[in-house]
Amino acid sequence: MVHYAHSRDIDVEDAINAEQVDDQIARVVNPLALAFERSADLGATFRALMADMLRQFLGTHKSIRLLMKNREENPSAVADAMSLTREQIEKVYVVALLLENPEQWTERYLKDEWRKAYERHLLDVDERSGLTRYDDFLKEHADGLENERKGLGISDEEKEFVEWRYRNPPGTPRPPHLKAASKTIANFPMPAEVIDEVSDPQLKDALRRWQREYGYFSGYSHSGFRKLMPGFMEGNMRLTTSEKEKVVETEYAQSIMISYLATGIACTEAATRALPRGPSGGAPASKVADADLLVKVSDLWDLLDRTSLVGRALYEMRMRHVLPPKFGAP
């Protein structure tokens, strides 16, 4: 199922105070990130990565709010706010995959980052090795990447595969001895691929529904016509100021709500997932969040369910099944 058929509407007069919601979101994200950092029986790299990822939702959201706030000075910036919202949507898939298998996907995530850095280094060598002022930089960068490679446990074959892929155009037959390396240092999965890796059928459905938002907002990151619309509106003198503001309210202001939803989904999955503990996950699984924090997450969804149809769809499809029940709920 990739949609939710609504039988209850929201109250369109039930407006939100964005500053208050920002504060409510922060009171969920910050203690949850801290809870990961303090969970010493989780892998050190995984818990640090999760804490940073959760906090980044707040950082990106602040940028979205700033772009929307300054739209009178820079009308085209509202389209950039939508591009950042797409980033928020995508981070949900990263969080979901990291939680699916912390050890496996943390390693893959870090290998993917090293691969990108190494490919960039190879390009720098190709383009700048003839410039004397880059001699020291290229050598020091190569040494740093090599030390990082060894620290991450990236094999010689994986390094060779990155070099081979960099040197050869797509479609070039891969050397047989690099077959295994091509899988272990492959790109970190995109959202559609993440869905295939998720084991929980209910979460799969919610992520499929969420992918509809990802596809729509991707039009802003891929320079579709919607990205150009703010400039078009500014140059179209037939639109009144109130008509332009109506477009902002119906199209671009949703960037703020979708950003709230992205943060809410990620925090819900991170707070409610029972994670394997101890060396190699040998200890009983347990949640990172305590009861008080779970109540805060549930209170956040009470707001998101009440004020957004997208939020209500996601709440009914997934969140209500993993969060503490609302008071008086059926």
PLM features: what roles do these ranges have?
Residues 75-132:
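Long, hydrophobic, well-ordered secondary-structure blocks that form the structural core
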Residues 1-48, 115-330:
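Secondary-shell segments that build the walls of catalytic and ion/ligand-binding clefts
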Residues 35-100:
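Long, hydrophobic/aromatic-enriched structural stretches that serve as scaffold segments
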